[in-house]
Design a protein with these regions (language model features):
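Small-residue-centered hinge/linker elements
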Residues: 2-116, 123-156
Length: 156
């Protein structure tokens, strides 16, 4: 009985070794990594502010995004050859017009440099500066039927 268990275990290990060696293949010690095409997603939520982080703005708000952080993500997507498209995921009531203009210019540079599509999607809200960013350089803008959107303008 013990002999049968031992023989079965040896046979099982032999079969497993063959299967593993077949799956592993022969790559001469080189690691092969395949990176599929990707879509870069940039989230723009909360108040849109100028600067590089939330401590740079006048009111020291902690919820929101800054033009510097968004522009950095756009540049990273432009530099990554595996990125085939850019999606802006927007849920913001707006913010600084200056920040929106900075982000818009960076999006236009992205499109000119890469020729890759830009798509904006809006969640609960896409208003004011956020809406301006969405329509600035996007090939398509998508919103839910209940998305609060629009309101590009100024008060005099």
């Amino acid at each position: 009985m013990l002999k049968k268990i031992f023989i079965s275990a040896v046979l099982l290990l032999a079969v497993l070794s063959i299967v593993v060696s077949m799956l592993k293949g022969n790559n001469n010690g080189e690691k092969t990594v395949s990176v599929p095409d990707r879509v870069a997603v940039i989230n723009i939520s909360g108040t849109i502010m100028s600067g590089t982080d939330s401590n740079d703005n006048l009111f020291n708000q902690t919820s929101g995004v800054t033009s510097g952080s968004i522009m950095k993500q756009i540049r990273e997507a432009a530099a990554d050859d595996s990125v085939k498209a850019l999606v802006l995921r927007i849920d913001s009531g707006g913010g600084s017009a200056t920040a929106a203009e900075e982000i818009g210019r960076e999006l236009k540079r992205f499109k000119e440099k890469t020729k890759k599509p830009v798509v904006a999607t809006m969640g609960n809200t896409g208003a004011s500066a956020a809406y301006w960013i969405a329509v600035c350089a996007s090939d398509k803008v998508y919103a839910n039927a209940t998305t609060l959107t629009g309101s590009i303008g100024v008060y005099i």
